[in-house]
Amino acid sequence: MQLFPAIDLRGGKVVRLTQGDYDRMTVYGEAPCAQARQFVEAGARYLHVVDLDGAKDGTLSNYGSIAALAEQGGLYLEVGGGIRTEERIEKYLSLGVDRCILGSVAVTDFDFTARMLKRYGERIAVGVDAKDGFVATHGWKEVSAEKGVDFCRRLADAGCVAIIYTDIACDGAMQGTNLALYRQLAAEVPGVAFTASGGISSEAELLELKKMGTAAAILGKSLYTGALDLKRCVELVQN
């Protein structure tokens, strides 16, 4: 299983939100590159970066930080947050970003998403955020009428090979992740590499996710609070 420690950026700082709420933000550092180096030292080979400003208002205010992370290298780098145009995808890929994550635009413009999946293949992942089982968009403020599992099936049919699935209720809450959900996704949407995201806070959960065939897991607040030790997690489950 791949482990993606997460760096969420707001105003160039390393932060975490609780359940996607911008008013419940904790700053964990001022230097994203230094944080990434710490992850490398712990054995990480992958990095999940979210531009929270981009996700909220489409700006590129964290572009410099992301460019510096890409230039620093040493990690497979996936980036999400505010990627809604092919121009933005190209901008990131040309920096050296390995994979771009499409979020809300996958719901609001499925045709565009299908075209990007066809054009860029495995260099595109889709982030699916679900609230009570239904797809949520725009920083989790809007909830659609489509079930997350059904949306994942549509994405798979459009050629999507990687989906980062977040159960919003779990995210940043440090109460554990929704293991039953990832078991269901693996069974009902075969052929897609799912990344578990949100609430993972124990080694037992990581081992269970690996056992059920989950492709990857994102670790956020659990690392920053010290609930999980990245070096130990890498030794336990990383390919």
Language model features: what each stretch is:
Residues 48-51, 78, 101-102, 125, ...:
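Conserved beta-strand positions in the central sheet of alpha/beta enzyme cores
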Residues 11-12, 19-23, 90-93, 97-171:
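Conserved anion-binding
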Residues 60-67, 141-150, 175-184:
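Charged helix-capping and loop-helix junction motifs
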Residues 8, 39, 47, 92, ...:
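Conserved, mostly hydrophobic/aromatic
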Residues 46-64, 104, 165-175:
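Glycine-rich, proline-tolerant flexible connector loops at the mouths of alpha/beta enzymes
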Residues 72-73, 77-98, 180-216:
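Catalytic cores of alpha/beta
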